[in-house]
Swiss-Prot record:
Tissue spec: Expressed by the venom gland.
Disulfide-bond pairs as recorded: 48-63, 55-72, 62-87, 74-85
Keyword field: Disulfide bond, Knottin, Secreted, Signal, Toxin
Protein name: U3-lycotoxin-Ls1n
Molecular-function GO terms, alphabetical: toxin activity
InterPro entries, per database record: Spider_toxin_CSTX_knottin, Spider_toxin_CSTX_Knottin_CS
Domain remarks: The presence of a 'disulfide through disulfide knot' structurally defines this protein as a knottin.
Residue span(s) of the pro-peptide: 21-44
Amino acid sequence: MKFVLLFGVLLVTLFSYSSAEMLDDFDQADEDELLSLIEKEEARAKECTPRFYDCSHDRHSCCRSELFKDVCTCFYPEGGDNEVCTCQQPKHLKYMEKAAGEAKKFGGKIKKWFG
């Protein structure tokens, strides 16, 4: 019986040690991947077109707002023949961002009350 107990403790110890090493390896890989994604995002962010600026040269270059990417909207100004394109945020996305911000504030208040 002592042998079975000793063998069980040894098995549990080895299992926990091996799983801890595997988790460390995964954490390191995740950190490296996250850093590379952040670097790529920073590099990409330098090339984006700000809101209300001309995006006719590249219609997919609009910057991101807090939650959503702006959309290149083209129109013909009154009395003009030239098409004008600017990066704009659609109204429904603007309202969704505003609602998400209010929900975040409300969640903070609830945490403050009950946390």
